[in-house]
Structures are given as structure tokens and as C-alpha cells.
């Protein structure tokens, strides 16, 4: 074990401090450091400002304490070393290098072998030596004192063997066979004694069976056994002689009912019976045919905008839109790149003749001939040179159409078209087949108890039953004859007090006592049997029509009506949330095989199927080839420490180390096992007579001696103190009956008697009114599964399903070729069940069945009338001895027992209470005066002191200023119930009720003769008050009483700081479209656009009109006249001319129609604050509020100075043996001190107390920190989790503001709340706490609806909670944790109104204009409806429009903490110019 000196201990403790403390979020250097005498110390530093004073820095506070020195005894000249406080005794050891340390407790004997130390002083007397040789026989001793009483004698001769006893319990496990292996461990010399370590060996084999033991002693006399079970019946005896005739028997039972007579004729129809109980619901019918489609319903209201859907697949291309208006001419574009060469045109007509060619060489001179006759045409000459290209010809006629081109690539899908209007209703389809059998309906409500059945005919006799269970013990047998007298027994111990003796005869009649207080009312007697029905009264005059009543409770479900005709289709409802999928019904029975249907049309390709289940794992493959060696990976992170390895082999012996510092005193070790007894020593020489010893401790109590003879009668002693009451004695026998007592004085007035027993049932009462419908019973457990019922009639046609949304278009399939007809298919699965056939004709009546089994026992009959009281019976025998009396008072303490065996060392106990302060030490020397410390934080308020004597009355002071009126107090507890009032007069007639459900149609009555109309009778007199009706349900909590007298005017409050700008509200509704603005001026011409990218080549345009003839070319040199050519063909078309300049702008177009209103813009900034209104009149003073919250508890005071040193610790465990081999060669020394000197002297050295003072201070600081975690204070530095935790830790604290941190962790996000210490509630303040009173909403709409303040009203806001200094999301997180830690929440809201109704509308008498409030989980909480979502009004001062301010206080309580706090409020009765409101938001409280 490592022994630590004080410095190491401090380091460890400092680390421990750091680990225990939670994050306080403070900079160590700044917040936790301390300054003393101009010197800065870090948190947890320990220093000595002077030798006898020690200080520690504890989170910014300096704690100092004086060092207390112990006396240095047996020292002639103690010295105080430099810088130390306590004196030590110097030694004369000049050669030692240092002062010797303090001596430890005496160690156990070490293990020193064969080392001769220096000669020591003579030792103390050694232990007794080994046993010597036997000594001579001594003289005869004196007669001893009489010995203790001998044991009982040997038992008598054994009796006859008893019957074998029951098998005994299993014996303890035997020792194993190899006992030698269990003797492990030997002696542990360090502990100072031998320890026998018994280790369990393996179980040995079973030994041979032992011989039978000796016969046991005869058992005691057994108790009388229970009477045996009755024996089997004996064999029947012979027939006896015929007896005399008996007396006539009792009249026999009624015979069985005769067979029913023939049916009588049908009587006239009786009056309509009372409405029967509803029948049990029928089984669900078979699904009916599909109904005809209903008419289109009216268009439903627009649904709330849905969540944005996923992007749809692209729709098909839309049809081309209409042609737009002609645009303005654009700027002239840049010259485009040259187009591709056009197709070759048709040949043009030949152009005009070209200019004459050059002059040819002169021909030979011809002969001038006369003109000859015209010759024939010569052969065609050679082709002349090609002329220039002529102008372009006219376009040719269009060619015939070319072959069809290849299909283009599919275009991209167009945008989805608008949803088509609903189509006309389709032709009604053929009726569908009945659907499969539906799943069984839910278990119907249990029907009412049916009427009692008629008594069944007696059943056949049953078989003989099995043997019944053993009967209970029979009555005790008759008293046996008295046995012989036994020997006289010893006198028994005193019996318990006897039971009460029989009652003595009554005493004389006492004088009457004073009148007692009236007893409490007795319990109501049981309700009498119902009286017989009285005769019908005369019909009263017809009353006036009453006002419509409140809606009645829903009646019981009526009998099933006839199937109605299908109703008109209702308007399309909003899409409900999708329900949870129902459980699969049981498959119906297979129907008969239907005829084979026609082959269906080929369906659209189905949606992609769900992924299949994963396939079974394949068989294990062959192992793959080994892969290539991978690259070396990055170095891994350092792994966690591995488990400790096995112990290595022992190393070589190290050198002797230097002696370490002495350790702290250890705890005492467990006591060692007792050593073996030593052998008896030799008889020693008789010593001299010793001096008389001190009186020894009191010995253990000896065995009692034999009884001495009685002593002489002593003197009368003084009266002893009363002893402690003894234990209960055994019960004594009953005493004889006492004589009758004398007449007593009249008794005191008695206490009110207990509530009397229930009275005898009264006479049969009148039939009671029909009771109110009871609350809905808890659902019964599911019944067992019933048998399958018969198929019910078809149900009514279901309503039309909603039209499904258009599915995405599937990919177009290619048209398949018509397939060849297939082979005949296999028989199809059985078709659905056919329609139910018509019922068959009635069958013949069956043969009479066998006699049925005995019916169940009928219900118990109504109890008969009570018989007359019987005469008193004779006095019964003396009762059984009563139960044992109550436990007596505690007896005197018994004699001291023998000391028990030493227990195991227990675990260390928890810290004890601090001991009483020690005596004050001697005052130290006065130190220099320290600098004035910083003022400490204020301490906690002290406990109130004892009340001092009353001072003289002071003079009358001046009257103080009026205090501000407090906040409104919570409603007081409910008062005690008042006395029962007189039965009231009948109430006013209720409002007219809503019509009930239609009853079943009765049979038509006969036509009555019209009666003459009677005169209206006079109203009857008011009847006597009726009997008290049954107790109604408790009413709603009454509204609070009227305001108390007004309090004194409070002083005017200081004007509050300007609030921060509220959060941006939701955008307002769009305004009406504005009038169109004037046309703007023509804009400047824009910069020239860049050249566009080259477009794709367009199709050839139509042929243009013929171009204008080009200008005349320059005149050529005159040629010689050529031969006239033929007329040339038309030339090519000229090039297009340049684009002209842009024309002037056209006139302005007509004004366009006004466009649709754009979306509303973002909310504008809040307008400037308007001028202040006139000061309002002073309000009525509010009621006096509850006491204000408790102030913040002070910060923790500084830790006190360290306490006085504790008592010395227990001695440490035995030290290890010292290896003395280092001293082996010393031998006897001539010079110098004995090296073992310090190992010998047995006086304990004085401890060095100052080393422990530093540790004490650190531990005290640590203890404070841990204590603050275990018991939080509710301060900002040490917040609690909830106020309930604070109340548990500090039940005496008062209600007030405290800090809590529900999410724990760092305390920087703690929040300030109000703790109600009476209830443990945690109340979080709203921020801000009110909505100013003003006109918040103006609306000209006649239609009133609820307007949410935070969501709809301009400038409104959702209510938020928590501190100003907390971010809103931090407060929300804390509230979430607070809700999780709580089981109930409540909150009040005060609505200030001016001409606005908050709860009850007094004029209309209903709650339709009541406020709505919104919980934090967005649930709406109303004034009426489901009780889980309704609030209550504690005070309602806003029931009508008075033109003055009033207020209504509403409260909502729920165990669903997620609904609180309230985050928004919606009034309905607002919007007018005179209607104003404001809200005070109360704190939300969780418990």
C-alpha cells in the first residue's frame, strides 16, 4: 500500500475537489481566487500567514484557523523550530542528519530470524514456559465449596419403540473426502496468530448405511383426533315387518302444468305498451349491392391549405395558345452568319444576246452571186459558248408530298392540365355481387337482464356424484367420565386476569342525567319497497308552450328502424385523417363455384410491387483465395487499459530502501482469531503475597445457587418506588358476580352519540321518477368469442366514396397483337356467395323432444315482509373464554446476558453529529492586525431569538403612506357545508327540450269521435313542496363572492420602461385593388443587345414577291451589231434590301383590365406611437392581494473556521515485519547511540498537528460543496431542480422567488420562479405579464367569430414565459423538463373587458361568445363541451355591455401538463369601435 505524505494527499484532494464540483461557469483566476495582505491566492490554495495560523482559499473566501499544539510531556527543554508553531523535544543524537519522526503505534511482533542485535536492557517477565516434569504430589487441599447442581440422571429404560416418525429435513452437507487439502493457509505471522483457512474440497463418495439407532423414548400423549369420516353404508338389512299406517301426509306439490289449450281468437289490439328496452344489436348484415351514384353534392368549403405535395410528373404538352398581339419592331440585328446553300433552282430562261464577239479573220473574197433561191435548212451548227446567267425564274408548282419521315424523339411532357370538372353521372352499373362477409362487429353492450324464465320441467335424476371433500370436524363428543386424580402439581405461576364475570343484577335506577347533545343523523334507512301504482289523476288543462329546453342527454339507442331510402349525397366533407388500419377479418366460408366470367380487358400495368422478402441464406461458399496484403493502416487511438495481467515471477530482492515518512494512523484491524491455548507451564515457585488488587470489574452472573433456608423476618423497609409494569400474566379464572351497586350520582352530559344503526325499512315508497342517465360505465372485459350468427339482412347502401385523385400517367404501352385464343383454363376458385335465396316453406312440426335437463336455479325471490320480533330466548351458557388481554406495560429489564461473539467489522457509519466543543485552548500570542477584509455576503437569517421583555410603549408615530395594493389572492378554501335548507318551491319551468329521437311507429288507433273543445280550466293551487329529490350531481364551482370593501388607494406606480418591439405579426388580409396609375413616360432607348446565338436552320419560307428591277448598268463600248437573239428567260431574284429604320412609336393602347390582386406584401414597420390618450379615471381598487413572494434566500455564508481537532484515531493495523538484515553486522556498539533506540521506548511521541490542519480546511470546503449539491438552496449559484425538491429539503422555508434548473447541467440557464412552499408548486412568470387595455380589433363584418390575439390581431403576440435574461428557446427547454417532472398544472388568466363578453352572455343566457384559449400543444380549450378541454370561470364580470371596464378570471387545471402554459387567447365579442379589452396573464404553476 502506498503511503502518502501530506503534499501528495493535498494534490489528490485538490483533484477530488475539481471532480466533485459542478461547472460553475466562473473564471478560476477571477471568480475563485482570494486576496489577503496584497497577495493573490488561487482557489483551494493553503498557506500560513504566520507560524500558528493556517488559511485556505475557498471559492473566493479566505478561511483561517489557529493551529492548536499538544503538550510536550517528559521533555526538559522543548524547542520551537524556526517557522513552526509547536514545540518539539530535541534529542541528543548529534550524528543523525535529521530530527527523528514521531513514533508510531506499537506494531505487532515482527519476523526476525537469526540476527543478533546489541544487548538490550532486561526485558519484562516472559510468558509461561513449556510444561516441566511432573512435580511431587501436593498436600491434600481444603474441602471445596459445594458444587453446582448436578445434571439430570440417566434416562430410564427405553419404552417400546414408537411408530416411525416423518422423514427429517435434509442434513447439512458433509465434509468432503480430502480433508487434508482444506487445511490451507497455515499461520499468518503478521497478524499475530494462526488462521485456519478451510477450503471446501470435492464431495466424497456416499458412506455405507449406518446401523439402526436405539429406540426413541415413548412420545407424549397425543391430542384427541378429529372424528373420522363417515363409513361406507352397510349392507342393507332384511325387510322389516309392515308398520302401522302413518298419519295423513301433507298436501302434495302442485302438479305439472297441463298442456296448453287451443289458441283463443285474436283479441282487440291493446293500448300501446311502454317503450321496450332496446334489443341487442343485430349482427352486421351482408354487404348490400353497390348503390346508385348520388347527385353531385354542393361544393364544400375550401379546405385548409394542404402541405405542399411532391412534384408531379410532367404533363403532356398543352395546346398552343392564341396568337399574341404584334410586338413593336425590334432594332436592326447584326448581320447574321451566311446561311447554308439553298437548293438548286429551276433553269431560268435564256438571257439576252451577249455583246458581239471579237472580229474574226477576214474571209476569202466571195463571188458576188445573185441571190439564189432559198435553200433548205442547213445542219445544226456547233453549240455556241454559254451565255451569262439569266434572271431567276418564277417559282414552280409545289411538288408531290415526300414519303413520311421517321418518327421524331418524343417531346418533353407538358405542364399538367387543370383538373377537369366532374363528369356527368355514369349509367348505373349492374348490381354487384354481395361482398365477402365482414369481420365480426364490436362486442355489443350487454343487454338488460331478461325476464325470469318459467320454471323448467324437472330433469332426469343425475348420476351419483364423486365422493365429497372431508367434512368439517363434528361437534365435540359428550364429556367423558372424570379420570383418576393426578399427583399434586407444583404451584402454578400467577394466572392472567380472568375474563369478565357474568353481569351482576342491575343497580337501582340512577337519577336522570343532563340532556346530551343531539346525535348525528342516522344513516338513511334502506329504500322501501316500491308502492303500488296510484290511480291516474284527472287530466290537467293544457299548459302553455314552454321555452325550448336545453338539449337532453342522448336517449338509449332505439330499436333498429327500417332501412331508409338512400339519402341525397351530402356535401363533400374535408378529408379526414387516415384511420388506423383495421385488423384483418376472418376469411369467410368459400361460396359455391360461379360461372366462368368473360375475359377482362387488359389492365394498365400495375404499380411496382413491394420488395420481396429476403431470400434464404445460400449455402456456405468455398473459401476465397487469400487477398493481397493491405497497406498499413493509420495508427489507432490509444486503446483502453487492458485487464491486469497475471502476477509476474517474483523479482530479485531489491536493495534496502530509505525509510519512508511515517503514514497516517490507520483504522483498527479486525480482531484476530483466538490463538491456540499454550501448554501448561511448570509449577512456579510460590511468589510472595501480593498487595491487595484493585476492585475487579463485576463478574458475569453465576448460575443460581440452591435455594437457601428462609431468613428471619426483616424490618419493614421503606416504601419502594413503583416498579415498571410487568408483562401480561396468564388469564385468571372468572370472578364471581358482584353484588348490585349502589345508586350512582347522575352522570355528566354525554357526548353526542355515534350515528345510529340503519332504521327498519320504511313502508313501500311511491314509485320514484325515472333516474338520470348514469355515467357511462367502464367498458366491460371482452367477452368470449360467440358462435357465428346467421347472416343478417343486407345493410343500407353506403355513401358514395370520394373521387380518387388522378394518378400519374403510366408509360404508353405498345399495342400488342391480338393473341391466339388460349386453351381452356383450369376450374376457377369458388366464386363469391350468391344472393340469399327466398325462405323455404315452413316445415312440419318435429317430434316432441326428450325431457330437458334441469334448468338453472331461478333468481332469488323478493324478500318477504319482516316477521314480528321473537320472544327473548333463555339465557345462554357461559361464553368461551374471551381473547387474550391487551399487552401489558413493559416489564423490568432482564439480567445482563452473556457477551455475544465478536461481530464482523461493520461498514463505516455515516458521519456522526459533531461532538461537543472541546475546552478552549490557551490563547495564542496576539498577531499583527490583518488588513480589513472585504465585507462578506450577508448570512442567512438567524433563528428568531427568545422573546424579550416588553419595552415601554413608544410614542405614537405619524401615519405611514398607504402601501400598494397587493395582487389578487387565490380563492380561499371551501367553507364548511351549511345546514340543510328548507325544501324550496318548485323551480321555473325549464326551456323547451330538443325533440327526442323518433319512436317506433305504433299500430294505427281507431278513429276517435271529435270531442268538443272544453273551456280552459283555472290554474290549480300550488301543490305542497315535494319530497326531497335524489341528490343532484355537484354543481360547477360557484363564482366567487362579491368584492370586499375597497382597499385604500395605492400610490401611483412608476412609469414602466418602454417595451421592446413586438415580434412581426402574421401578414394581414389583402387590401382591395387600387385604381390604375397614370401611364408612365416613354423610357429611354435601351442599349443594343448582343448578337444572339445562331438559331437552328428554319424551314424554307414561301416564295417572295418578285423583286424590283435593278438599276441600269453603265453603258458598254458599242459593239458591232450582232444578230438579234431570241427573247431571254427571266433572271434570278435579287438580294433582299437592307432593313429600314425603326418607325415612330404607335399610339398608346387601351387601358388593360385590372390584374388580380398580388400577394400581400411583407408586414410594414410598426407605425409611430400615437399621442398618449387622456388619463383614465382611477380604477376601482383591487382586492387585497396575497402576501408577496419570499425574498431571495441569501447567498451561502462563508465557511466557518476549521473545527477543533478530532479525538485521536484508533490504533492502526499491525505493521509488517521489519527486515533487520541491514543491521545484522553491527554487533555490540561501543560508540554512538543504539540504532534501534527508537524502536524500543514505549512512550508515544506528540503528533504533529499542523500537517493535518491543511487537510482539515480542504475537507471542510469539500464537505460544504457536496452538502450544497445534496441539499440545494434555490439560489442562482445553487439552484434546485423544482420547488418540490426545495420543499422536501427545507420544509420550513417560506414561499417566495427561488432559482430552479429543471434540466440540471450547467447552472447558467437556471430561471427564477415563485415557489409555493405550502403546496410545493413551481410557478413560472409570463414575460410580458399583460396585454395593454385598448381597442385591438376593428371589423365591419356582421358575422362574429373568434379572433386569435397572437395569430390574427395586428400587434398581438403569443404569450411567452421565463426570465428576461433567458433566451426563449432556453426557457422552452426548461419548461419541457418541468412538465416532465410534474403531474398537474394550473393557470389563471384575467380578461379585462369594456363592452366585450368574456364567458356568459347574460342577454342570451349561453356561453356561445365565451373566450377560447390555446394550450402550448395547440389544443383549444373552451368554456363548454368535453370536460377535459374546458376551463372554469372563477369570477365573471363581463356578462353585458355597460360601457365600463370589468374583468373575468378564468382558470384551467389539467393533469396533462403538455397543455400548459396558455399561449394565446381568442375573444369573439370584439371588433366594434367601443369594444376594448386587455389581458393579465397569471403564472403557470406545476406540481
Swiss-Prot record:
Residues 218-239, 310-320, 335-350, 370-382, 391-431, 622-631, 656-667, 833-848, 877-913, 1148-1157 have a biased composition (Low complexity). PROSITE patterns: NC1_FIB (PS51461), VWFC_1 (PS01208), VWFC_2 (PS50184). Residues 26-181 form a propeptide. Residues 360-369 have a biased composition (Gly residues). One of its GO terms (biological process) is otic vesicle development. Pfam families: COLFI, Collagen, VWC. Disulfide bonds join 1283-1315, 1323-1485, 1393-1438. The modification 5-hydroxylysine is found at residues 190, 287, 299, 308, 374, 608, 620, 1130. Isoform 2 is highly expressed in juvenile chondrocyte and low in fetal chondrocyte. Residues 105-116, 133-154, 251-265, 764-775, 1115-1129 have a biased composition (Basic and acidic residues). Its main location: secreted. The N-telopeptide is covalently linked to the helical COL2 region of alpha 1(IX), alpha 2(IX) and alpha 3(IX) chain. The C-telopeptide is covalently linked to an another site in the helical region of alpha 3(IX) COL2. Contains mostly 4-hydroxyproline. Prolines at the third position of the tripeptide repeating unit (G-X-P) are 4-hydroxylated in some or all of the chains. GO terms for cellular component: basement membrane; collagen type II trimer; collagen type XI trimer; collagen-containing extracellular matrix; endoplasmic reticulum lumen; extracellular region; extracellular space. The modification 3-hydroxyproline is found at residues 670, 907, 1144, 1186, 1201, 1207, 1213. Changing residue 303 to D: In KD; abnormal allele expressed in the cartilage. The keyword Zinc does not apply. Belongs to the fibrillar collagen family. The C-terminal propeptide, also known as COLFI domain, have crucial roles in tissue growth and repair by controlling both the intracellular assembly of procollagen molecules and the extracellular assembly of collagen fibrils. It binds a calcium ion which is essential for its function. It is linked to Spondyloepiphyseal dysplasia congenital type: Disorder characterized by disproportionate short stature and pleiotropic involvement of the skeletal and ocular systems. Spondyloepiphyseal dysplasia, Stanescu type: An autosomal dominant spondyloepiphyseal dysplasia characterized by glycoproteins accumulation in chondrocytes. Clinical features include progressive joint contractures, premature degenerative joint disease particularly in the knee, hip and finger joints, and osseous distention of the metaphyseal ends of the phalanges causing swolling of interphalangeal joints of the hands. Homotrimers of alpha 1(II) chains. PANTHER family: COLLAGEN ALPHA (PTHR24023), COLLAGEN TRIPLE HELIX REPEAT (PTHR24023:SF1082). This is Collagen alpha-1(II) chain. It comes from Homo sapiens. The lineage of its organism: Eukaryota, Metazoa, Chordata, Craniata, Vertebrata. The gene is COL2A1.
Amino acid at each position: 500500500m502506498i503511503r502518502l505524505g501530506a503534499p501528495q494527499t493535498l494534490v489528490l484532494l485538490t483533484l477530488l475537489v475539481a471532480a466533485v464540483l459542478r461547472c460553475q461557469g466562473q473564471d478560476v483566476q477571477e471568480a475563485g481566487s482570494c486576496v489577503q495582505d496584497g497577495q493573490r491566492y488561487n482557489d483551494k490554495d493553503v498557506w500560513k500567514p504566520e507560524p500558528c495560523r493556517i488559511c485556505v482559499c475557498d471559492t473566493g473566501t479566505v478561511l483561517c484557523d489557529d493551529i492548536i499544539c499538544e503538550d510536550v510531556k517528559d521533555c526538559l527543554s522543548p524547542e520551537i523550530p524556526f517557522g513552526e508553531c509547536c514545540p518539539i523535544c530535541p534529542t541528543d543524537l548529534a550524528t543523525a542528519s535529521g530530527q527523528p519522526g514521531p513514533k508510531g503505534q506499537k506494531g505487532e511482533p515482527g519476523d526476525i530470524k537469526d540476527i543478533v542485535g546489541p544487548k538490550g536492557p532486561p526485558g519484562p517477565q516472559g510468558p509461561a514456559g513449556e510444561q516441566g516434569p511432573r512435580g511431587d504430589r501436593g498436600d491434600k487441599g481444603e474441602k471445596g465449596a459445594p458444587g453446582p447442581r448436578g445434571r439430570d440422571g440417566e434416562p430410564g429404560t427405553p419404552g417400546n419403540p414408537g411408530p416411525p416418525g416423518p422423514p427429517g429435513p435434509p442434513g447439512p452437507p458433509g465434509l468432503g473426502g480430502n480433508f487434508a487439502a482444506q487445511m490451507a493457509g497455515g499461520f499468518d505471522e503478521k497478524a499475530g496468530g494462526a488462521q485456519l483457512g478451510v477450503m471446501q474440497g470435492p464431495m466424497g463418495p456416499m458412506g455405507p448405511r449406518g446401523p439402526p439407532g436405539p429406540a426413541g423414548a415413548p412420545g407424549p400423549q397425543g391430542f384427541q383426533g378429529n372424528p373420522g369420516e363417515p363409513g361406507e353404508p352397510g349392507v342393507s338389512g332384511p325387510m322389516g315387518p309392515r308398520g302401522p299406517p302413518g298419519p295423513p301426509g301433507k298436501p302434495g306439490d302442485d302438479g305439472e302444468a297441463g298442456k296448453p289449450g287451443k289458441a283463443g281468437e285474436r283479441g282487440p289490439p291493446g293500448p300501446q305498451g311502454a317503450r321496450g328496452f332496446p334489443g341487442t344489436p343485430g349482427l352486421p348484415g351482408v354487404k348490400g349491392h353497390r348503390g346508385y351514384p348520388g347527385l353531385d353534392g354542393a361544393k364544400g368549403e375550401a379546405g385548409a391549405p394542404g402541405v405542399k405535395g411532391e412534384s408531379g410528373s410532367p404533363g403532356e404538352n398543352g395546346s398552343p395558345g392564341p396568337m399574341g398581339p404584334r410586338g413593336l419592331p425590334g432594332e436592326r440585328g447584326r448581320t447574321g452568319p451566311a446561311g447554308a446553300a439553298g437548293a438548286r433552282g429551276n433553269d431560268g430562261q435564256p438571257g439576252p444576246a451577249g455583246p458581239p464577239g471579237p472580229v474574226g479573220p477576214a474571209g476569202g473574197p466571195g463571188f458576188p452571186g445573185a441571190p439564189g433561191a432559198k435553200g433548205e435548212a442547213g445542219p445544226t451548227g456547233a453549240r455556241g459558248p454559254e451565255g451569262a446567267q439569266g434572271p431567276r425564274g418564277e417559282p414552280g408548282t409545289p411538288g408531290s408530298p415526300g414519303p413520311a419521315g421517321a418518327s421524331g424523339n418524343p417531346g418533353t411532357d407538358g405542364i399538367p392540365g387543370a383538373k377537369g370538372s366532374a363528369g356527368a353521372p355514369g349509367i348505373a352499373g349492374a348490381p354487384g355481387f354481395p361482398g365477402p362477409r365482414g369481420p365480426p362487429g364490436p362486442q355489443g353492450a350487454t343487454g338488460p337482464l331478461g325476464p325470469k324464465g318459467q320454471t323448467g320441467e324437472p330433469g332426469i335424476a343425475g348420476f351419483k356424484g364423486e365422493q365429497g371433500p372431508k367434512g368439517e370436524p363434528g361437534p365435540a363428543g359428550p364429556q367423558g367420565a372424570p379420570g383418576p386424580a393426578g399427583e399434586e402439581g407444583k404451584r402454578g405461576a400467577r394466572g392472567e386476569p380472568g375474563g369478565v364475570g357474568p353481569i351482576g343484577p342491575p343497580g337501582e335506577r340512577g337519577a336522570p342525567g343532563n340532556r346530551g347533545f343531539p346525535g348525528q343523523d342516522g344513516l338513511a334507512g334502506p329504500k322501501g319497497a316500491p308502492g303500488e301504482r296510484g290511480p291516474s289523476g284527472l287530466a290537467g288543462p293544457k299548459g302553455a308552450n314552454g321555452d325550448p329546453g336545453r338539449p337532453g342527454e342522448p336517449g338509449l339507442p332505439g330499436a333498429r328502424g327500417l332501412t331508409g331510402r338512400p339519402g341525397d349525397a351530402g356535401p363533400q366533407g374535408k378529408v379526414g385523417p387516415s384511420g388506423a388500419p383495421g385488423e384483418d377479418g376472418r376469411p369467410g366460408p368459400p361460396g359455391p363455384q360461379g360461372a366462368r366470367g368473360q375475359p377482362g380487358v387488359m389492365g394498365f400495368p400495375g404499380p411496382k410491387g413491394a420488395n420481396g422478402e429476403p431470400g434464404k441464406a445460400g449455402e456456405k461458399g468455398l473459401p476465397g483465395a487469400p487477398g493481397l496484403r493491405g497497406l498499413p493502416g493509420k495508427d489507432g487511438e490509444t486503446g483502453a487499459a487492458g485487464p491486469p495481467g497475471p502476477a509476474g515471477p517474483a523479482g530479485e530482492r531489491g536493495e534496502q530502501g530509505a525509510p519512508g515518512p511515517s503514514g497516517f494512523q490507520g483504522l483498527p484491524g479486525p480482531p484476530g482469531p483466538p490463538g491456540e491455548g499454550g501448554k501448561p507451564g511448570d509449577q512456579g515457585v510460590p511468589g510472595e503475597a501480593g498487595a491487595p488488587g484493585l476492585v475487579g470489574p463485576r463478574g458475569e452472573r453465576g448460575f443460581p445457587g440452591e435455594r437457601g433456608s428462609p431468613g428471619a423476618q426483616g424490618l419493614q423497609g421503606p416504601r419502594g418506588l413503583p416498579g415498571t409494569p410487568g408483562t401480561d400474566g396468564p388469564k385468571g379464572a372468572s370472578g364471581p358476580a358482584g353484588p348490585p351497586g349502589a345508586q350512582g350520582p347522575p352522570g355528566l352530559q354525554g357526548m353526542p352519540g355515534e350515528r345510529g344503526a340503519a332504521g327498519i325499512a320504511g313502508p313501500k315508497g311511491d314509485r320514484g321518477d325515472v333516474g338520470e342517465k348514469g355515467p357511462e360505465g367502464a367498458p366491460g372485459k371482452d367477452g368470449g368469442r360467440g358462435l357465428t350468427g346467421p347472416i343478417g339482412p343486407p345493410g343500407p347502401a353506403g355513401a358514395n366514396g370520394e373521387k380518387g385523385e388522378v394518378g400519374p400517367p403510366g408509360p404508353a404501352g405498345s399495342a400488342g397483337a391480338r393473341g391466339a385464343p388460349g386453351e381452356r383454363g383450369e376450374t376457377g376458385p369458388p366464386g363469391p356467395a350468391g344472393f340469399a335465396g327466398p325462405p323455404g316453406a315452413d316445415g312440419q312440426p318435429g317430434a316432441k323432444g326428450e325431457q330437458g335437463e334441469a334448468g338453472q336455479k331461478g333468481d332469488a325471490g323478493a324478500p318477504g315482509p319482516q316477521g314480528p320480533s321473537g320472544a327473548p330466548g333463555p339465557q345462554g351458557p357461559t361464553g368461551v373464554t374471551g381473547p387474550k388481554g391487551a399487552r401489558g406495560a413493559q416489564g423490568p429489564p432482564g439480567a445482563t446476558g452473556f457477551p455475544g461473539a465478536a461481530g464482523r467489522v461493520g461498514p463505516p457509519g455515516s458521519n456522526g453529529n459533531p461532538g461537543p466543543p472541546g475546552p478552549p485552548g490557551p490563547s495564542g500570542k496576539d498577531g499583527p492586525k490583518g488588513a480589513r477584509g472585504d465585507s462578506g455576503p450577508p448570512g442567512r437569517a438567524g433563528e428568531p431569538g427568545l422573546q424579550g421583555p416588553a419595552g415601554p410603549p413608544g410614542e405614537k408615530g405619524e401615519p405611514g403612506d398607504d402601501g400598494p395594493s397587493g395582487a389578487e389572492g387565490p380563492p380561499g378554501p371551501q367553507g364548511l357545508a351549511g345546514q340543510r335548507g328548507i325544501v324550496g318551491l318548485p323551480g321555473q319551468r325549464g326551456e323547451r327540450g330538443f325533440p327526442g329521437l323518433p319512436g317506433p311507429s305504433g299500430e294505427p288507433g281507431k278513429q276517435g269521435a271529435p270531442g268538443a273543445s272544453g273551456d280552459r280550466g283555472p290554474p290549480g293551487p300550488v301543490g305542497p313542496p315535494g319530497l326531497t329529490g335524489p341528490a343532484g350531481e355537484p354543481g360547477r364551482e360557484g363564482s366567487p363572492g362579491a368584492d370586499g370593501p375597497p382597499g385604500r388607494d395605492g400610490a401611483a406606480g412608476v412609469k414602466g420602461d418602454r417595451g421592446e418591439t413586438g415580434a412581426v405579426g402574421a401578414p394581414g388580409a389583402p387590401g382591395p385593388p387600387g385604381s390604375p396609375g397614370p401611364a408612365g413616360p416613354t423610357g429611354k432607348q435601351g442599349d443594343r443587345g448582343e448578337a444572339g446565338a445562331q438559331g437552328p436552320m428554319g424551314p424554307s419560307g414561301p416564295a417572295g414577291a418578285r423583286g424590283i428591277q435593278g438599276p441600269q448598268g453603265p453603258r458598254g463600248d458599242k459593239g458591232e451589231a450582232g444578230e438579234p437573239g431570241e427573247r431571254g428567260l427571266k433572271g434570278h431574284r435579287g438580294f433582299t434590301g437592307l432593313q429600314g429604320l425603326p418607325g415612330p412609336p404607335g399610339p398608346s393602347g387601351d387601358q388593360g383590365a385590372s390584374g388580380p390582386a398580388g400577394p400581400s406584401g411583407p408586414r410594414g414597420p410598426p407605425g409611430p406611437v400615437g399621442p398618449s390618450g387622456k388619463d383614465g379615471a382611477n380604477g376601482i381598487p383591487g382586492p387585497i392581494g396575497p402576501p408577496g413572494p419570499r425574498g431571495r434566500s441569501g447567498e451561502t455564508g462563508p465557511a466557518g473556521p476549521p473545527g477543533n481537532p478530532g479525538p485521536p484515531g484508533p490504533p492502526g493495523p499491525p505493521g509488517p515485519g521489519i527486515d533487520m538484515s541491514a543491521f545484522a553486522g553491527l554487533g555490540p556498539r561501543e560508540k554512538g547511540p543504539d540504532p534501534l533506540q527508537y524502536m524500543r521506548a514505549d512512550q508515544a511521541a506528540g503528533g504533529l498537528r499542523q500537517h493535518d490542519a491543511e487537510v482539515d480546511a480542504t475537507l471542510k470546503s469539500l464537505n460544504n460543496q457536496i452538502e450544497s449539491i445534496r441539499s440545494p438552496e434555490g439560489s442562482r449559484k445553487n439552484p434546485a431542480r423544482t420547488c418540490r425538491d426545495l420543499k422536501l429539503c427545507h420544509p420550513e422555508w417560506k414561499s417566495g422567488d427561488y432559482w430552479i434548473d429543471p434540466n440540471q447541467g450547467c447552472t447558467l440557464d437556471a430561471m427564477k420562479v415563485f415557489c409555493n412552499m405550502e403546496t410545493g408548486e413551481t410557478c413560472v412568470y409570463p414575460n410580458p405579464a399583460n396585454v395593454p387595455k385598448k381597442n385591438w380589433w376593428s371589423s365591419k363584418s356582421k358575422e362574429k367569430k373568434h379572433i386569435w390575439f397572437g395569430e390574427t390581431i395586428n400587434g398581438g403576440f403569443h404569450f411567452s414565459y421565463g426570465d428576461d435574461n433567458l433566451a426563449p428557446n432556453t426557457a422552452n427547454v426548461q419548461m419541457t423538463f418541468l412538465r416532465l417532472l410534474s403531474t398537474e398544472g394550473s393557470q389563471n388568466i384575467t380578461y379585462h373587458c369594456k363592452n366585450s363578453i368574456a364567458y356568459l352572455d347574460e342577454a342570451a343566457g349561453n356561453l356561445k361568445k365565451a373566450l377560447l384559449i390555446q394550450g402550448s400543444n395547440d389544443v383549444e380549450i373552451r368554456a363548454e363541451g368535453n370536460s377535459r378541454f374546458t376551463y372554469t370561470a372563477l369570477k365573471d364580470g363581463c356578462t353585458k355591455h355597460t360601457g365600463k371596464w370589468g374583468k373575468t378570471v378564468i382558470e384551467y387545471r389539467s393533469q396533462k401538463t403538455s397543455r400548459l402554459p396558455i399561449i394565446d387567447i381568442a375573444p369573439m365579442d370584439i371588433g366594434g369601435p367601443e369594444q376594448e379589452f386587455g389581458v393579465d396573464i397569471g403564472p403557470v404553476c406545476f406540481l
